[in-house]
Amino acid sequence: MGYSNPRHPAHAAHMRTDAAKHTKNENEDMSEHNVNTENEPTTDAPVDETVVVKDEEVAAPSMSTVERAELLLKQDETIARRIDEGATLDEAVDPSNKEFGPLAHPEQVQMRVAKRAMMLKDGLNPYPVSLDVTDTIEAVRAKWDGKLEPGAETGDTVGIAGRVLFIRNAGGLCFVQLAAGDGTTIQAMLSKKQIGADSLKLFKQLVDLGDHLFVKGRVIASKTGELSVFADEWAIASKALQPLPTLHKELNEDTRTRKPYIGMIADEKIRNMVRNRSKAVSSLRHTFEEHDFLEVETPMLQTIHGGAAARPFTTHMNAFDLDLYLRIAPELFLKRCLVGGIDRVFEINRDFRNEGVDATHAPEFTMVEAYEAYGNYDTIAALVKELVQKTAIDVFGSTKVTLLDGTEYDFGGEWKQMSMYDSLSEALGKEITPDTSVEELGSIADKLGVERDDVENHGKLVEHLWEHFYEDKLYEPTFVRDFPVETSPLVKAHRSKPGVVEKWDLYVRGFELATGYSELNDPIVQRERFVAQAKDALAGDEEACDIDEDFLEALGVGMPPAGGMGMGIDRLLIALTGATIRETITFPLVKPLNS
């Protein structure tokens, strides 16, 4: 065994030997039920740094975040001091936490902290800057999988790194399962004859499940044909202080939501969602670029909230002593781009709406909005259909996708269309038109038990009644067309139907996926709509838009006729996979445990 500058902590715990080649009788495999016999057992859930202590179990002290952080540092320093003074790993830890109390590190974390301290004492860096990683686990698999007979050896020396998922100790031989970030695994074998007794002993002493491990050695097949790397060298690439959950058990919902990084390690479905989301966004961008759309970025902080009917988040800018809103939509700025001569424009970015949270709504979400000069709500519907279908093909290889519950859903073929007023009239058995009074609509809503708004108008009542009959029943892709003018202040009046605007909502599997307009570009009519919205706001409607005089001035410069669309990226993933909105967002907002 030899170290590179062995007493300097800037170097890794890097073991190598020039011992003779292994013998074939050392080739054994890790079973499916591998255990780490030298280290602590795994737990059902990762250790939570925010400890919740029930009053009936332990009288936990009241402690601020800073106080607890200082407590944990003091415990870390105490463990390190004991190691420096010659204590063994077992002697350095306090399983019952008599000294530091119930909010201190549990025993498993203490043991890992002690191993970190032991590495530093011996001049080994538990977090080296770099290692001689020359190959990926995926590349080794791709090159050699299925091509070696049991017991075969190659002359291919590789340097790989991955997270330790399993360890099995067979005396003079250790088997380790290493996982790459995408979940691809490979077996590494560490033999006393190859790396030396001291190096193998150190491996057993220091390496835990969850550590990132570097291994350099020859590619072989074990006697049962398992593709393996037979180690000449090994090094800890990153020492994990928190234990992993038990990987063969499904993670509970709380762990998945609060600790998404654990979910990525333990659950292939979560890793796939992250990758599929990235593929979906790339596909959307590619389709827009094929149609000569230009991507822009518009302000997140806005002085006026507009572009959608939603309650905004508010904040304050100290430098200007100015109240601001987190944007609820980029629409008014993207339309300014049309005024400026960018005829095809899109943006993929975050929006914020201070509203309820459920399976299809989140306060922070990602939207794509696009505007096409000289288009309308028909041309933009065709574009959205193409966007969705191409995304399904680019992510899953077909317009027919398999949802998480195993059912199939087909985005191919022709998509249905229906009129909001005609379909509502059919459901009620009586004609509803833009001239139907608020009183009559309110009476119908009361008889049906439909919830009514504090500030209501004809358009809101029509939409609520329509949603009562249809919203969760439109399973196949369906464009619902021609909305009331009152709820669509930024949309152009229908070219042939008075009192109706050229707007559609796209419904998929019972929820709204996207919306599209023929965009209003008459500044006088737009001012009328803004004034009506402002009056609703004064009456208590928190979702009503403000009057944006700068936008009205921009319209006065001249905006070409246009079609526009908006679609939630999170909802697109819901449609493609059957997940909830939280499952599509890599780091969803969750209420803190101590709030």
What do the PLM-derived regions correspond to, one by one?
Residues 2, 21-595:
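Class II aminoacyl-tRNA synthetase catalytic cores and aaRS-like
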Residues 2-8:
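Extreme N-terminal basic, low-complexity initiation segments
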Residues 9-15, 19, 23:
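Short hydrophobic alpha-helical segments enriched in small aliphatic residues
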